Amino acid sequence: MKVKFLLAVFLIVLVVTDHCHALFGLIPSLIGGLVSAFKGRRKRQMEARFEPQNRNYRKRELDLEKLFANMPDY
């Protein structure tokens, strides 16, 4: 009777520790996911403030500089 009781307690402790280990392993990934979600939302909010035609202004400006640099002088 004692052996069955000890075996049952051991299995319960084993299952509980396994679940706790899984939970504590999950917490850092949840925190990382929340942080990246907030950063992504902040980025989307900043992009929404700019007009669509001005969003890629710097890229177009660099393309024009490259185009003018390659044009021959007349």
Swiss-Prot record:
Keywords: Amidation, Antibiotic, Antimicrobial, Antiviral protein, Cleavage on pair of basic residues, Membrane, Secreted, Signal, Target cell membrane, Target membrane, Transmembrane. Changing residue 25 to R: Increase in antibacterial activity. The modification Lysine amide is found at residue 39. Residues 45-74 form a propeptide. Disulfide bonds: none annotated. One of its GO terms (cellular component) is other organism cell membrane. Its main location: secreted. It is found in: Secreted; Target cell membrane. The keyword Secreted applies. Expressed by the venom gland. Residues 1-22 form the signal peptide. Coiled coil: none annotated. GO terms for biological process: defense response to bacterium; regulation of defense response to virus. Belongs to the non-disulfide-bridged peptide (NDBP) superfamily. Short antimicrobial peptide (group 4) family. Mucroporin: cationic host defense peptide that have antibacterial activity by breaking membranes. Is more effective on Gram-positive than on Gram-negative bacteria. Minimum inhibitory concentrations (MIC) are the following: MIC=>100 ug/ml against E.coli AB94012, MIC=>100 ug/ml against P.aeruginosa AB93066, MIC=25 ug/ml against B.thuringiensis AB92037, MIC=50 ug/ml against B.subtilis AB91021, MIC=25 ug/ml against S.aureus AB94004, and MIC=25 ug/ml against the methicillin-resistant coagulase-negative Staphylococcus. Its synthetic analog mucroporin-M1 is more effective. Mutant mucroporin-M1: can inhibit Gram-positive bacteria at low concentrations and antibiotic-resistant pathogens. Minimum inhibitory concentrations (MIC) are the following: MIC=12.5 ug/ml against E.coli AB94012, MIC=100 ug/ml against P.aeruginosa AB93066, MIC=25 ug/ml against B.thuringiensis AB92037, MIC=25 ug/ml against B.subtilis AB91021, MIC=5 ug/ml against S.aureus AB94004, and MIC=5 ug/ml against the methicillin-resistant coagulase-negative Staphylococcus. This is Mucroporin. It comes from Lychas mucronatus. The lineage of its organism: Eukaryota, Metazoa, Ecdysozoa, Arthropoda, Chelicerata.
